[in-house]
Structure formats: C-alpha cells, structure tokens
Amino acid sequence: MKRIIVILSLFFGFAFGADFSLNEYRTPLISVESDGTATIVDSPEILIGSSGVVLHKFDTDSSIIARVSVVSKNAGFAKVRFEVFDLLEQKDLPLPGIAPASGDIVVLNYLYNRSLIVVPNKEIYEEVLGAFPNMIFIHPDLVGAYLSYEYKPNPSRDDFRKMCAQSAAGLIFVAMDGRSVFADCQSFKVLKEFKTGEVEYYQLPFYTRVSDIDTVFWKLNSEHINNYDAHYEKLFEEDN
C-alpha cells in the first residue's frame, strides 16, 4: 500500500508545520459487481484504505445507503468495497433496503477534516494541535470517558470505530515512539506516516484527563496496557 512518509525533526518538527489534507472526492459508481465491490474513476485525492459513503437520490433528496472503502487502484480506475454504514445501525432507524447501483454517488475521504487523537503525553498533544490547525481533533477526554464507562483500558479497533461514528470523525491520529500516523478510522489503513522522535514518557492508555479507566472482573477482554507502542502498532497490522 502506498503511504506518504514525512521525516520531521525533534518529535514532530512542528516549527515548520506538518501538512496533511485529503479533500473530499465525489464521483458516480460506474459499475457494481455481485461480490460487493464497484468501480469508480480514480483520483490523486484518494488512497487505498480511504473510506466514504454512497449517496442515493430519492426524488429531490439524497440519503446515505452504504459505506465504501478503496481496496485497489489501477489504470485510472479504483475499486471500492461496500460496507454497512455504522450510523445506520440503530434499532430505531431501519436500514434502507436499497443496494448501491450504477449512478449512485460515492463520497470518499468522508469526514476527513475530523480526527480522534491518541498521544502518549500532554506535551505531544499540544504539539499536534499546533501542527494541524485545520484539523478538528476530537478531545481525548471524550474517548477516555467512553473507555472508563466500558471498563476498557485497552482500546481496540472497534472501540475507536464506535467513537469515530459517535463523534462524526473519519480519521484517527496516533503518535508512537519513532513514528506517528493518520489512519482511516474504519479500515485502519495508514494514509500518512511521519517519522518522529523518541517519546520521553507515557500516560496509559493515552493522554486524557480522565483518570479512572480501569478493568472489571466480568469483562475478560479488559486489561491494562503494559506497552503503549506495541498496543497501538498492533492496531495497524494488516491481519488484525
């Protein structure tokens, strides 16, 4: 998978800034296959792992009927895979009984101006905010409060996906020792990577002012993180 890698001084070298921007890209579905994939026209704005939504027009209005993620790019075209749109998975909102079809509009890089932020300490948190002034970062206390309520001091992909859905965020930013990444919050594909410096100290499970993120005996998958970097690196493993 193609990634954008930037080498930065200090931890992030934010004195000269760190640019990251993937503009929203709209294009119609050209063809839809029986295996749950479809073809669209490619664009430099989209990367493998970029996600978005499918819009279907009902008379004068349009509605989201599915999620999509980019799975391949070749010869001026890109293949996308359909998924259930998370925000529609509510018992009071029936799922639309409409399958994506040719002519429906795909909106990729959806909500890519909003991101969760996972960093090991307050100083790095403040650096990141200063480096990406055009990114709307969801305050880590919101994620911390969710994990505290769920007794999950070891957040998983699904935990972050839920928080992205609840916060209307399309990205997750994670700072680790030696590298930091922006990734799609649903596919967890790394979209941009920064080579960074050494982390001097860690707050677990990440920097937040919520202090009571603890375990509970009846949750077998709940345990404290011993190694911050190993835990978050695992989230981005291809087979995870």
Sequence positions of predicted segments:
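Sec-dependent N-terminal signal peptides
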Residues: I4-F14
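Surface-exposed, polar/charged interaction patches used for macromolecular assembly or partner binding
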Residues: G17-N240
